[in-house]
Amino acid sequence: MKRLSIDLETYSSFDLGKSGVYKYAESEDFEILLFAYSIDDGEVKVIDLASGEIIHEEILQALKDESIEKWAFNANFERVCLSRFLGERLKPQGWYCTMIWSAYLGLPLSLEKVGEVLKLDKQKMNEGKALIRYFSIPCKPTKTNGMRTRNLPHHDLEKWSTFMEYNQRDVETEMAIKKKLSAFPMPQSEWENYCIDQNINDRGILIDEVLVDSAIKFDEILREENMDRAIELTGLENPNSPLQLKEWLNKKGLEIDSLAKKDVESALKNAEGDIKEVLGLRQELSKSSVRKYDAMKNVKGKDNRARGLIQFYGANRTGRYSGRLIQVQNLRRNNLKDLELARSLVKNGNYETLEILYESPSDILSQLIRTAFIAKEGTRFIISDFSAIEARVLAWLAGEQWVLDAFENGEDIYCRTASRMFGVPVEKHGVNGHLRQKGKIATLACGYQGALGALKAMGGIEMGLSEYELQSIVDYWREANPNIVSLWWDIDSVVKRVVKTRSKEKYKNLVISYEKGILFIQLPSKRRLAYPKAKIGMNRFGGESIVYEGIVVGNKWDKIESYGGKFVENIVQAIARDILTEAMMRLEKKGFNIVMHIHDEVVIESDSSSIEEINEIMSIAPIWAPGLILDADGFESEFYKKD
């Protein structure tokens, strides 16, 4: 036996979508119902564990044998569930995930959607969702079902038979996907990165249970107080209803089209009296400050560690990681100077003092979300992140030497950019210091062919800049960065040429090719970005553009239009991702326990190592990136925060 393809059907009273697989498999009533498998791509067999069948010893040993490949679509689910079933942790070595391989080739992270895109003969069965609802989750007790809370096989033998067919079909579909993808193997280095990712997810991160419970309780108190006050002021049955509140505001003489955050903020600028207070209460009531605390409570296991928070290859156009469950990639920044004081007041339930000291207690709860992640006793977090990594990689790729020199000399890149743009010295809090903000917004908004719209999205108008000033910032920045501008147009030209001629071209340290309907961009690391079904289309201006297929808003598979600057953004972010994975590989090999990573930052739980040592490891450029200057900065803390 060389390869085992697997799919499980399971039961647990925990909600998989809310709790994640680690907590799901911890449930006292967790059970594997069906075990479908194929040995070396042979016939698929289904073991009906729920009806008393057993898994053969040969298969059990194969699951533990790291030299035998175990394949599944979303293999993390199978590995974690089987670890619980066997009573021992199955290490990720030897486990391979067809979902990850699909993502590597620009395909969806869903078995059903991949099957549709690849037009497989054997698609995932549509009956599956209804069968899972029937057999895999608790049912509502009714007189008709004899007040039972769970459906077992004998309650509907016909459905159970279909469930077994569904289980078998999932393995057949997974194997068919594997066969289709075999022409484009994923590099071994990426499977090694996947193993590290699985180890990090298995390790998890500790949640401060007391802080979480206190924050949720305080939010309930705040919401009740704010609702009572809003009812008192408006006389409305439900002042949190946009329809009712808009009508009340209109009667008071305030014409407001929407109660969206920006509209309320705008209206507050000129509001007075009751209207001002009611709008302020509306802001407080609409804040979702405790949703992430609720998510933490749902996800944390018996040991209070939250696991499965990071999705490997979650962003399949770049290969970057994405957040799951608590969505750690999207945490509110903290800017409180007395963060520890606020944290301790909430944790100790000292709500009255908190309300006296802070104008917006709900805002404080939002800022404390990060601090609910804590280091275990006897350790502390070392938090280290790359400094301006995208700006560094972009300049390195384009050969924009003055930017590289600025980074090498330790200069403030926003000051140096402004100086280059306007031809005058710029110093932070010094001579021409007011220009630094323009250098900053230009650096952040213009690097990927961003123009007026990008600067507006970055908040340029809110900063008091006119459209004319914003356009001049774009023009000055492009003039100051000719090599980056050339990079956009060069990439655009090469990609179009390759798609038209179905050829292969080397550009700088990239290789761009078209193979079997897929546009590939090989990065300096040798990893490839994939753009399925790429072809020449027409943009809204009547010019040529590249169109490929991928996941769009609403999780739909559709056509996506792209251009030079957008491809450059994908390439730069993908290279930055590869730098992060190499750094994490080095850290893990040296025995450092990464418990979380967010964007370009790693969080390590350590009892002895120093921040200097971690930063030094992070700052090592990969051998495939000669001349790239990296820098990492960090700090230590007993809880997670932004420094």
Task: Annotate the PLM regions.
Residues 1-2, 60-64, 365-380, 585-589:
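A short acidic-Thr-Gly-centered motif at the start of a beta-strand
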Residues 1-16, 34-36, 130-365, 380, ...:
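Conserved "right-hand" nucleotidyltransferase catalytic core of DNA-directed polymerases
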Residues 5-6, 73, 95-97, 373-389:
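Conserved catalytic palm subdomain of right-hand nucleotidyl-transferase polymerases, strongest
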Residues 12, 76-88, 105, 246-251, ...:
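Short active-site loop/helix that positions an aromatic residue
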Residues 27-37, 41-182, 337, 417-422, ...:
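Active-site-proximal helix-loop-helix substrate-binding element of RNase H-like nuclease domains
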Residues 169-175, 565-585:
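Conserved pre-motif C helix in the palm subdomain of viral-like polymerases
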Residues 181-193, 579-599:
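Active-site palm subdomain of RNA-directed nucleic acid polymerases
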Residues 463, 616-626:
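A common structural junction motif
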